[in-house]
Structure formats: structure tokens, C-alpha cells
Amino acid sequence: MGERGEVYSEKLFTESERTYFFNVKENRKGDYFLNIVESKRSPSGDFERHSIFVYEENINEFESNLLKAIAVIKQKVSTGSVGSSARHNKGYGEYGERSKLDDSRFDKKSHLSGGRFKKKDY
């Protein structure tokens, strides 16, 4: 069956109080997957975690698209076309939490009538 469980793990500590974990794991069937986790401290002192899983069958496409996205960021930074983080974080508070946006002009009944969309309270 192999090594089952965690095969590889790397932590990345940042100055913005975020920690990223890059984990390679093996499931019960012997398949490998990548688990990327972001952990950050919330204003209340708790930790908020966000996680994505990338499975073996998608790893090549994921790598290709991730490298393209990173190249765009690097190109934008090198040409100085990246603005202040405040502009890019619309709808987020000082600590990265979602802030309630003004939806007073939004017709909730017509948008929600299909039942597919639900109002989120942040």
C-alpha cells in the first residue's frame, strides 16, 4: 500500500500572519494528492483555515495553470502595474475578513426566485 498518510509537508511562514502548508498525501487506494492549506489568525484570535485538494489526475493541468497565474503576477509586479492592496481587497476588512457590502439597490426577490442563490450574511 505504500506510505499512506502524509508523504511530504512544507510550511511557509509569511510576514502577513499567514502560514501556508504544502502537503502531499496518499489515500487508502494508494493515490497521491496535493493539499494546500492557508492558515491565518482572525481578529478574535482564532485561526481560519482554507484548504484545496489537487488529485493525481489533475496535477499536470493544475501545475500549468498555476505557473501561468504566477507568471502574470510576476510580470505585473515587475512593470509596476499592480496597485495598492486596498484596491484589490474590496469587500474585505483590515484582517482579511469579509465585510458586508451595500446591496440596497439589489432586487433580492427577482434574483433569489429560482432558489439557486441564497443570501449570505457575512
From Swiss-Prot:
Residues 77-122 are annotated as: Disordered. InterPro entries: PUR-bd_fam (IPR006628). PUR repeat repeats lie at residues 3-76. GO terms for molecular function: purine-rich negative regulatory element binding; RNA binding; RNA polymerase II transcription regulatory region sequence-specific DNA binding. Residues 77-86 have a biased composition (Polar residues). Disruption phenotype: Essential, it cannot be deleted. Keywords: Cytoplasm, DNA-binding, Repressor, RNA-binding, Transcription, Transcription regulation, Translation regulation. GO terms for cellular component: cytoplasm. Residues 95-110 have a biased composition (Basic and acidic residues). Induction: Highest expression occurs during conditions of slow bacterial growth and division (at protein level). Inhibits its own translation. Transcript levels are high in unfed I.scapularis larvae, decrease as the tick larvae feed on mice and rise again as the larvae become nymphs; mice that been infected for 1 month have no detectable transcript (they remain infected with bacteria). Transcription may be under control of DnaA. GO terms for biological process: regulation of translation. It is found in: Cytoplasm. Both isoforms are expressed in vivo; the experiments here were performed with the shorter protein which is shown here. Homodimer. A transcription and translation regulator. Binds DNA adjacent to the erp transcriptional promoter; in combination with BpbA inhibits transcription from the promoter. EbfC counteracts the effect of Bpur on BpbA. Overexpression leads to decreased amounts of ErpA protein. Binds DNA and RNA; binds preferentially to RNA (dissociation constant 13 nM), dsDNA (dissociation constant 130 nM) and least well to ssDNA (dissociation constant 390 nM). Binds to its own (RNA) transcript in vivo and in vitro but not to its (DNA) promoter; inhibits translation from its mRNA. Belongs to the PUR DNA-binding protein family. This is Transcriptional/translational repressor BpuR. The gene is bpuR.
